[in-house]
Design a protein with these regions (language model features):
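Structural preference for solvent-exposed beta-strand-turn elements
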Residues: 1-176
Length: 176
């Protein structure tokens, strides 16, 4: 049996480490442009943390097979973050459930640093303590789990809404 999740690359970046926490053989697949998208940074990070992962090619394009053993051993992982912050955020999200203390080290220039800050802020509010060490190194103590959910206000994505607002100025009808 399986689940079909009709979403894009962000969902893949989030699901790979979540599935690695489980137990069993998981296949992540997609269609269209998702089959062309490399998933190498996340795959390399998970391998460094002790996860068995197989990709279609050296860039880990879909389909990807995860052999999950009931948890992620953990340790130190160095991550390329020069293209996206998604790998870092996804690793920070699952780090409190990893088997031993974990260090996430960013090897190069971190793009989208505000997204990492948001991730850490939300995790802190859920009771997860992430310590930033020298440079771009994050240390997470194992087995923290999450405390009960806190109430969050999610603000609108005004940068994306701008396209719809501009479209409404161009047509003689409502854009909703």
């Amino acid at each position: 049996s399986g689940a079909r999740i009709k979403r894009g690359p962000r969902m893949i970046a989030m699901m790979m480490p979540i599935l690695a926490l489980g137990k069993g053989r998981f296949t992540i697949n997609g269609k269209g442009t998702l089959l062309k998208r490399p998933n190498k940074p996340m795959a390399q990070a998970l391998r460094a943390l002790g996860v068995d992962i197989i990709g279609r090619d050296k860039d880990f394009r879909l389909p990807i097979i995860l052999e999950a053993k009931g948890g992620i051993p953990g340790g130190t992982v160095k991550v390329d973050a020069n293209m996206s912050s998604q790998t870092i955020s996804s690793l920070l999200n699952i780090a409190p459930f990893i088997g031993k203390d974990t260090s996430v080290i960013i090897k190069d220039k971190l793009v989208s640093a505000p997204y990492i800050d948001i991730t850490i802020d939300i995790l802190n509010k859920a009771g997860v303590r992430i310590r930033k060490r020298q440079g771009n190194c994050f240390f997470i103590t194992a087995h923290q789990g999450f405390r009960p959910a806190v109430k969050f206000v999610i603000h609108g994505d005004y940068s994306s809404a701008a396209f719809l607002m501009a479209a409404s100025c161009l047509v003689k009808s409502d854009v909703t």
